[in-house]
Structures are given as C-alpha cells and as structure tokens.
C-alpha cells in the first residue's frame, strides 16, 4: 500500500491539531507507524491525551483513497514533509503543513528569491495599484512572487507579477479545487500556468 495513503489518513483525521500530528511524526517517524501503533504506544508521545489517542483508532483509508483518486484525475501533485521536493524553508517553520497539494510546477522555493506580498481584501484603488507595481517589480527583478488568491492586495500582486512574465505561487487555504473568490478563476489558471 502506498505510504502516501497514511499521510493523507493522518492529515484528514478530524479533531487533531497540526502540532499534534507533528509530535506524533517526531515520535514514530512515519504516518504508517502511527497507523499501526496501539493506544499505549501513542500515549507515550509527549503531549498526547487519551482523547487524541482515541481519534487515531479510525483506521479507514477510504478518504485517503478518494483524495488520491481525485488528485490523480486533476493532475495535482502531493508532497509530504518527508519528500525531498518539500520546501525546506517551509519545513523549518514552527507549524509546517504535513502535506502540500500542488497544481502546476512546484517552484524551487529553497533556491529562488521568494517574496510574499499579502494584504487586505478591502483595499483602495491606490492599494491595488501599488500591489500590482510591487508584484511587477519583484517579478521583473527575478523574484518568485508568493501570495494568496484573495481579492484585493493578494490578487493585485499576482497580476503584476504575471504581467511582468514572472514566476508565481499562490497559497490557498480552501483546497486546490475551490477557487475563491470566483472572480479570480482566470487568475487561478494563469498562476498555475506560471508556477503553482
């Protein structure tokens, strides 16, 4: 069975905070080892409560199978914390996501100058103009422009970077298959074509 299924199982368990998942990974080494551990072994993990350990009794891999099939159908790549392609800069933050879903070409975050441009959704026309200029200037200078896909400053920075022919990456909080806001559908497609 694919080790990736166990990563998806772990990330899809409801009621576990990401910090709990990371503590379990530090203790056991892999999601597969967590999957097959008994409750007594799980309780030896620092900071794990009995309630949290009981959540790990759910050994259904159905949701993981669904996610794998959907990602394959849509052409999405799945990266785990243990994958060589997982960005080291992201891995070294306090609370790194266990799994990344990637649409497009994963930028070489650790090798490129990556600059995040984020801001308010409810911005003035001046704010939009400045964000587009920032995105354009950064991309023209060779930087990878990273932002959310939210309306306002985030979208403006990405549009500016794309206008400059630069590389972009959008970090989405709502899943790859959900474009929000809907008016950014074309921007979503353009960002995936110019990065991830």
For each feature predicted by the language model, list its residue ranges.
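Glycine-biased, small-residue-rich flexible motifs in mid-sequence functional cores and linkers
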Residues: 3-4, 81-196
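Short, small/acidic-rich helices and loops at N termini and domain boundaries
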Residues: 1-84
């Amino acid at each position: 069975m694919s080790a990736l299924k166990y990563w998806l199982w772990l990330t899809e368990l409801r009621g576990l905070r990401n910090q709990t998942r990371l503590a379990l990974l530090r203790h056991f080494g892999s999601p597969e080892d967590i999957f097959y551990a008994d409750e007594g072994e799980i309780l030896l993990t620092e900071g794990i409560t009995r309630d949290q350990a009981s959540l790990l009794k759910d050994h259904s891999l159905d949701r993981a199978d669904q996610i794998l099939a959907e990602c394959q159908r849509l052409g999405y790549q799945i990266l785990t914390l243990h994958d060589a392609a997982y960005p080291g800069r992201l891995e070294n933050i306090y609370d790194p996501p266990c799994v990344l879903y990637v649409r497009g070409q994963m930028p070489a975050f650790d090798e490129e100058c990556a600059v995040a441009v984020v801001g308010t959704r409810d911005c003035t026309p001046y704010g939009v103009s400045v964000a587009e200029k920032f995105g354009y200037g950064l991309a023209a200078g060779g930087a990878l422009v990273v932002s959310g896909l939210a309306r306002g400053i985030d979208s403006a920075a990405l549009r500016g970077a794309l206008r400059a022919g630069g590389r972009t990456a959008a970090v989405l909080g709502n899943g790859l298959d959900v474009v929000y806001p809907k008016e950014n559908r074309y921007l979503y497609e353009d960002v995936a074509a110019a990065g991830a």
